[in-house]
Structures are given as C-alpha cells and as structure tokens.
Amino acid sequence: MADYKSTLNLPYTQFPMRGNLPIIEIKILERWNRDNLYEIIRRKKNEKKLFLLHDGPPYANGFIHLGHAVNKILKDIIIKFKGLSGYDAPYIPGWDCHGLPIELQVEKLIKKVNMDIDINSQEFRNYCREYVKKQIEIQKKDFIRLGILGEWKNPYLTMDYKTEANIIRTLGKIISNGYFYKGIKPVYWCFQCHSALANSEVEYNDYHYSNAVDVGFSIVENVSINKIFNINCYIENIELVIWTTTIWTLPANQAISIHPDYIYQLVKILDNEKYLIIAANLVNMFMNRIKCTMWQVLGEVLGSKLDRLTARHPFMNFNVPLVLSKHIKLDSGTGLVHIAPDHGPDDYLISKKYKFKNRDSLIDSNGYYLSNSHNRLCGLHIFNANEIIIDLLYKSKNFLYFNANYQHSYPYCWRHKIPLIFRTTSQWFVNMDHNNLRDKLLRTLQQVRWIPDSGYSSMQSMIVNRPDWCLSRQRVWGIPIPVFVHKKTEVLHPNTCIFIEQVAQLVEKYGIQIWWDLKNEDIILNKAESMNYQKIYDTLDVWFDSGSTHDSVILDRFNSKLKSKLQIDLYLEGVDQYRGWFMSSLIIAVAIKGYAPYKQVLSHGFTIDDKGNKMSKSLGNIIRPLDIVNKFGSDILRLWVASSDYSKDMVISDDVLKNVTDIYRRIRNTIRFFLANINDFDPEKDLVQSNRMVALDQWAINHTLSVQVKIISNYEQYKFHNVIRYIMKFCSIEMGSFYLDVVKDRLYTLNKDSLARRSCQTALYHIIESMVRWIAPILSFTADEIWKYIPGNRSKYVFTEEWYDRLFKIDENQIVNSNYWNFFLNIRNKVNKVIEQERVNGIIKGSLEADVILYVTPILKKKLRILKNELAFGLIVSSVMVLSIDDVDFNTIKENHEENSDELKVVLKKSHGIKCLRCWNYTLSMSKNENYLNICSRCVHNITGLGEDRRFF
C-alpha cells in the first residue's frame, strides 16, 4: 500500500511541546541580562509619552514571600502592557531600608557572632547598612527570577545618601508649611519596639481577650446627688459605675465622664442595699451581667446635671471629678467612662478641655509601674497587674461588681504581634487640622481613581478618624529629625528650614551618621546662641521615608520629563497599604504640594490557601514563590497571578496550580500549532492580500481583531483575569473547536504554494503576531521564546513592540460578512450536536464518516448554497446535501434525525463512500490512476496539479 505522507504538508516546528520552564527561563534571563534588555526598551520608548508606576518599597528584610511575588508580577504586567500600548513605562524598584525590624535582625546577628560585643550607635548603623545591602541582593535576585524587568542596576533605596537627604528636605517642606509640632500626647507604644508607633504600624487582633470589670466610684457629695435626683429620704454611699477592659489604667484615673444628653438612673439593688448610677439604656444589660433580678429605679436625670460632682477613687487616695463628653456610646458598658489621660486620646482631650493638672506617668517605657502608682503595684508589669488590682477593688468596700474575660478587637504591633498601649510621651507630630489639611485630604480623594471603588471609602473613613501623625521614633537606625529646640521653651530654632537644607547637603555627602556627629555650633554658628539649643536625636517614622518618595525619588529621577505638576500615574500595593503607604504618601503630598501624588490607586488582596486561611508559619501553609518557580516555572506563577481576581483574596494550592498549568498547556499548544503550520511561510514572499484571502481566513483575522480590542480594553482596566479568559476562549473555542479544525484539510492536503493554503498561513501569521503580544505581559518567558520562532524580519524582543496593527475587519458589504458567519456557526453547532449523538450511539467514529442532509426553509437554502460544494469542509463531514424542508415526510426517513426547528432539520447517515488514505474523507470519487491508488480524485489533483480552488473554507 502506497504511503502518501510525503505528499502532505505536515506540521513541523522546533518550538518544543513541553515548556520545560524552570530550565529554559534561566537561559532566557541570562540573555536578557547579557543584552541589557531593560535599557533596550528604554531607548526604544524614550520619545513616547511617559507612564509612571511608582514602586511601593518592600522591606529589605528576609526572603520574598508570595505577597511580594503577586505585587511585583502585577506591576510587571502593567509596565509591559503599557509599553505595548505606546508608552515609555520605566520601572524603578525600591526598598525600604530603615527601622526596627532591621535593628532586631542586626542585634540577633551581633549576639550570634559574639554575645559580649559592645558597639556604639555609629557601628550599629554601619552593621544595619551592610545587612540591608545583603538583604536587597537576595530579594533582587528572586524578583529578577520572576521575570520582572526594571532598573535593577540602579534601584532606589531609602538609605541612599541622596534619598536620605531628599527625605530630610521633604520634612523641611512640612515644617515650612507649619504642619510640624511637638506635643505631649497619648501615642501607640510597643514595649518591644521601645518606641511610639503611628496608626499605619498598628493592626487589630479581633480575638484578643481582656479582663472586663464594672467598678464603683463613691459619690462624695451625697447631699447634692440626693437633690439632683429629687430623693425625699437621704441616701448615702451612692456609686458611679464604670466599665473598662483596661484594668491596668485604673491607677491612672483622673476623672469619670458622662454624656450630657443621655438619661442616667439612680437604681437600688434590693438584696444588698447598693445605690448605683448607670445610663438608663444600659441598666438591664448591667443587671444581667451581675445576675441581679431585683432592683428599683429611684430617679433619673440628664447627664449634664451631674457635671463637676466628685467621686472617690476606689483604691487610690484621691477624689476625681465627673466631666461631660460626647464620645460615650450606649452599645456596651454603663454609659460612664473612666478617664486616664495618659492612656487614651479621648481621655487626653477631655483632660485638656477641663485643664487637669499634669501628673507624672505611672509607668515606664517598658510597661512597669513606677513608685508613684501604688505600693502593691510598683515594679510590676501592667499586663501582670490584673489580679492585684482586682484584689484591691475587692478589699475597697466591694467596689468590683463584675469581672470576666471579654473578647474584642485590640491594637497590636504590626511587627511583634503583641498588644499595644496608649502612653503619653513627648513626640513630634504632623498636625492633621492645620491649614485645613484634613479637609483638603478628603477633597483630594475625589480626584483619584480608586481600584476597586471601595478604596475611596476606606481612605475617607481613616482620614476622618485619624489623629495627628506621630512622626518621631526613638530608634538608632533611621533618618534623623534634624532640628534644634530651645532648652527652656522647646521651641524650634527660627532658622530651622535653613538648617534643614544645610544638614541635607551634609547627609547627601556623608550619610545620616553626620547628624549624630555634628556639634551644635557646626550648624548654629553663633556659639553663644548654640548653647541655648539642644539637638533632637529622634528618627523619622519609616512611613515618612517611603511616603515621601514621590518627592524625594521620583521628582529627582524624572524631573527632565515631567511637567510642573507631578502626579504619578499609578500606585499599586496590597489592601493593607490604605493605612500605610497610600495614606502617608497622600498626607505628605497634600501638605507640601496641595494635590495627591497619584492619579490612580490599585490594591490587591492577600494570598490564602484553599481553606480560606492566610499564609502563616503556625498553620504550616506557606508556599514560597521560588518553590513554585523551581517546580513549574515563573510563567506558571505569573499566569496564576493574572488569572486570579486580585481584587479579592487570592487562593493558591496544588490543585489551583494544576489548573493553571492546564491553561498554560492549552495556550502553548495552540501557539505551537500555529508555528508548526507556518514553518515554510515567508511573510515577505507568501503573504496574501486581504481581498484575495479565503473567506474563513478573513473571518479569523476579523475575529482576532475583535478579541484584541477586548483584551487591550481589559488590560487598560487592569482586569487581567478577563484577559486570560478571552485568550483561553479564543484558543479553546474560536480557534481550537472551529477554525483550526476546519483549516487542517486545507493546510495539510492542498498544494504547498496554493493560494488557499497561503491564505490560511497568512491568517495564522497575523494571529500569532497578535497572540504573542497578548501574552507577553503575562507569559513573558514563553512570549520571548515564541518570538524567535515566528517567521519574518523582526526586532530582537517582543517587549520593544506595540500591539499588532495589521489585523483587519471583514468587508460588511460582501455576501459572506459577519452576520453570515454568525448564521453559519449556528448551523454548525446544530450539526455538531447530531454528530456527537451519533458518535455516542456508535453509528460513526468521527465526523468524516458522516454524510449530512440539511432540510431547510427556502431562505436558509439560498444562504447555504452560497457556500456551494465547500459546505462539507466547513462542517468537517464527507458530504452535505441541502434540501427543502417542505419536500419531505420525516416519518419516511429511516436514519436518525434531529428535530432542530421548523427552519432546520439535520439528518445524518454513515457514509457509504471509501476512505481516502490521504485526506481521510469518504468518497465515491476515488482515483483510477495506478500511480495514486486508494486516494480520492481531489487529492490526486492537489498532488499533481495546481490543486483545488477554495473561496470559503
């Protein structure tokens, strides 16, 4: 039997079926690095419109985690698609270099090397700087392995001398505009940080347990209280009941606050003759708490009537006043709040309103009670004091009414995961209400595009409720707050802004250590004057470091390409950065420039496992990005990021990665089919003009164009999961289940140089030129690999290109236009249902074994006959007859048929033809030529002559 394989145009390509990504990606990275790909792109795009995505700097500490990978990959996708869209989109990665976490790691390393080493602050800063350098190199290597293109040779570091100097200059602008002040306020305090924290460094633990207690304070003016409640008989020992979850603050109590507009009741507990004052709305809740069933209401008054009365502290030897405050709520407690000005912002404001005398703090910076607290508490840590305080309450005439564990949300240190306290200390702040800053921030929010929209409301609520920003930290490794204050008045030196610039110039040359080395007279040249001032040694909140980079880094790097009003196009970070980098950047920008630093803010969710748990060491569910890369390749990780809806938490697991691998395989195999079938195609010689192309090929290019429009639109909207969805649908349905199936006969069996075959190759060429660009931002390594297999002259890298612009629309004036193709595809789907049913029934094994009769209305018959004898190729069957639906009685038809509709009925029967060994069609028109036995006449014509002519399929 003759072998006709050599007469076929069988697909061939050296593009591998298997990606082998973990190995091939390393080689590609070596080439990118050798060629300096990032610089090639910059030179090519230099004259284009600038698009700036500013990198929120990750902390230079530890290996990268999955959250880092998600963030960097999303940024890289955007940078690359913006390049394809005709922008100059540079990417300057950055690192946050100062702060406590670095200090802690360096301390551990020093102790590990030499337990007895004693180093000074300067040496410690040097250790920190060297540690950060090493950490950056580790993280940089991992980010590059993910396929992230950027200015890795010159990233921005908040510890670069010039950046440190510029951050100090930004602080100078804050000071110059009047927002900077020193205040004694309660601030979040971490005992392990030994420092104040800003709101952005606080996270809330919803599963924190505290001792909740109801405590009685005896009224001193019993006569007055009897009159206020209009009690006829004289009552003694009336108590005000407060409820608190911070027992340790009771020794610091200085007042009890009540709401002026709430009703308060004097109630008598009948079984023990106790007289208590509680908010009327909370009496029942209180009685349930103490399991009291019998009480009597003796009277009620507005809270305002109780103002300025006094009560006796239950175990400290002093009286405290009743004061009015509208911050009290009626959702829990008793409607009376104990006021400890040292340990709460609202308490502090009340103390200022009522001009309380300043008292020395009762606790030190480590959380231990001082001698001025209580003799039983001195030297005890506040978190270990509950039992003693409860005992003091029991022994003080039974002033404790209720004591129980209470679960509630409580502030924790973002780094140490331990409870925080409010502690009144002297700190430096940004005044949120100076020059209407808070109102300006709220107005500015409306001018920013928030993605998702919920970002706007998140920022709005935080700004409304935000206290003044505490800028100062009591740390060693940080950018100094380089100011001088008068030793007596603590007022800033009048030349502070001049000094700031002088210090910045020195820091730019010598680094931050210079501030600690300087003497007063080095800056304040008048020696006598310098004696009256002291240098401040506090360091800046690290959120000021990173939050000022729009001014200290971007303005410096892109000044030549920027207009007078600098607004960065996009900030992109995790949802936790609304209270962090997004917020600090906004406050600084509005304070110094009057407008937002960014035009758009995009946030992404966290990574979670398939059970909905966040990644954590304790759960043992952490997946390192480099483990995924080493097993599957970076493109699989990138595809997972792109295919996930990052606006929510992103699920990752072995099953999820398996599904992503299947998606990748489908895309790769589709492109491999394209490459394999244009291996003998030279676009310089073989490209067919659109008006000469086969109709189906025109449809394919038209459809590719419509898909490309959707893909680009979804890239622009940052909806990358939709991009993947469109690509997958294109590969699996429009191409895989239709176009590529139909054109196989034409590609394989027609004359190699026939117009019909070259037409199809032209379509495949245009489509792959489009597809390689579609996937390049996401599957960067694979796109780079594909690029070198596409025929024709081209630039070295797809990343220097723009979206493919040689696709075209169908001429809608021609008969076989878009509407006609929709009509045909509807017919084809109905025929395929019948074919599949008969295959399941065992009548046929494949569609080419089928002869199909279409019974249709005259209108449909006329439309189908446009395709003439090519209809069978479009349906991938051996033969098709189109008959009138009115000319047949279906009861007389023995073959199975599908009652599709009143317009169309499909009848299928197994072909009685002979199978052609070359094209596999079944036909009665077999060759009688002795040189070409067992093949059909059509195949002989295609082998020996010019071949058949195709207009439609």
Swiss-Prot record:
Summary of the function given for this chain in its UniProt record: Catalyzes the attachment of isoleucine to tRNA(Ile). As IleRS can inadvertently accommodate and process structurally similar amino acids such as valine, to avoid such errors it has two additional distinct tRNA(Ile)-dependent editing activities. One activity is designated as 'pretransfer' editing and involves the hydrolysis of activated Val-AMP. The other activity is designated 'posttransfer' editing and involves deacylation of mischarged Val-tRNA(Ile).
Secretion signal, residue range per the UniProt entry: none
Intracellular or extracellular location(s): Cytoplasm
Keywords, sorted A to Z: Aminoacyl-tRNA synthetase, ATP-binding, Cytoplasm, Ligase, Metal-binding, Nucleotide-binding, Protein biosynthesis, Zinc
GO molecular function, one term: zinc ion binding
Positions occupied by motif 'HIGH' region: 58-68
Cofactor: Zn(2+)
Domain notes from UniProt: IleRS has two distinct active sites: one for aminoacylation and one for editing. The misactivated valine is translocated from the active site to the editing site, which sterically excludes the correctly activated isoleucine. The single editing site contains two valyl binding pockets, one specific for each substrate (Val-AMP or Val-tRNA(Ile)).
UniProt-annotated binding residues for Zn(2+): 916, 919, 936, 939
Family label: Belongs to the class-I aminoacyl-tRNA synthetase family. IleS type 1 subfamily.
Listed name of the protein: Isoleucine--tRNA ligase
